[in-house]
Amino acid sequence: MQRRSRGINTGLILLLSQIFHVGINNIPPVTLATLALNIWFFLNPQKPLYSSCLSVEKCYQQKDWQRLLLSPLHHADDWHLYFNMASMLWKGINLERRLGSRWFAYVITAFSVLTGVVYLLLQFAVAEFMDEPDFKRSCAVGFSGVLFALKVLNNHYCPGGFVNILGFPVPNRFACWVELVAIHLFSPGTSFAGHLAGILVGLMYTQGPLKKIMEACAGGFSSSVGYPGRQYYFNSSGSSGYQDYYPHGRPDHYEEAPRNYDTYTAGLSEEEQLERALQASLWDRGNTRNSPPPYGFHLSPEEMRRQRLHRFDSQ
């Protein structure tokens, strides 16, 4: 898959605009570092996409294990980067304030590797069960799997309520599954197994033994660690900020952190932005020839062969 080189990287510009509207000082450090790292890899890719994407054939059979680390940090194009990192921005703000920076960094690192491992297991199982070797050659790239895992965590910590997906109210606890199916139906170029892997990793953390295993391996710190003396708050009326917590006084004092989200999201929730992304994906695919799906991160064997031929022809 080859990134589009024509015109301006509108998605990247829009992402930077969102970051600066929120305010760099208002973004927790690990979330900000994750955004910066993904942007840096987009602007300075370490390898071409066909050399960094994740597949059973390349990673397991050919022992190219570095793809487990490279694939989440590479994106197909600027819009793929934008929608992933815009989602990471909001999930990171919520989860890092709740879990603490050190534990959140641990979660991001573990999820980045584990979603890749689960993806390989899913692809291998499907290839063996259906006797279809092409599944072992199917290659995936992007941060979406990690984001699905984080969405499971976010819904676990904020249960109840409904979200609007494609115009339909969906309970929070089912939102990940509905989004999984909706994205696959409306943007078939995306990796269903990659997104499913993220959901499964998230469930392993919230419902399974993964959290306890991570705590046992961490030793000196746990998910209960947070920002000392300061608590982030956000309520349904739209006000937000940082509230200092003092056990012996001044419990109601807070410092406002302005967050007028509507000025740069047009009043859209994350689910409504997803719907716009799916619609834009369909429009873009119908108006662009020989270009990768804008928000997917799936590389078929045919696409990989085409990219190799293109690389040799251009030399």
From Swiss-Prot:
Gene: RHBDD1
Main location, first listed in the record: endoplasmic reticulum
Residue intervals annotated with topology Cytoplasmic: 1-21, 128-138, 202-315
Family to which this protein belongs: Belongs to the peptidase S54 family.
Biased composition (Basic and acidic residues): 300-315
Topology relative to the membrane: Multi-pass membrane protein
Catalysed conversion reaction: Cleaves type-1 transmembrane domains using a catalytic dyad composed of serine and histidine that are contributed by different transmembrane domains
Stretches the record annotates as VCP/p97-interacting motif (VIM): 301-315
Induction field: Up-regulated by endoplasmic reticulum stress agents that induce the unfolded protein response (UPR).
Top-level class of the enzyme under EC nomenclature: hydrolase
Transmembrane segments: 22-42, 107-127, 139-157, 181-201
Keywords for the protein's UniProt record, in alphabetical order: Apoptosis, Differentiation, Endoplasmic reticulum, Hydrolase, Membrane, Mitochondrion, Protease, Serine protease, Spermatogenesis, Transmembrane, Transmembrane helix
Tissue spec: Expressed strongly in testis.
Extracellular face of the membrane: 43-106, 158-180
Matching Gene3D superfamilies: Rhomboid-like
Regulation: Inhibited by aprotinin.
Ubiquitin-binding domain (UBD): annotated span: 269-284
Active site (catalytic residues): 144, 195
Subcellular location: Endoplasmic reticulum membrane; Mitochondrion membrane
Species of provenance: Homo sapiens (Human)
UniProt protein name: Rhomboid-related protein 4
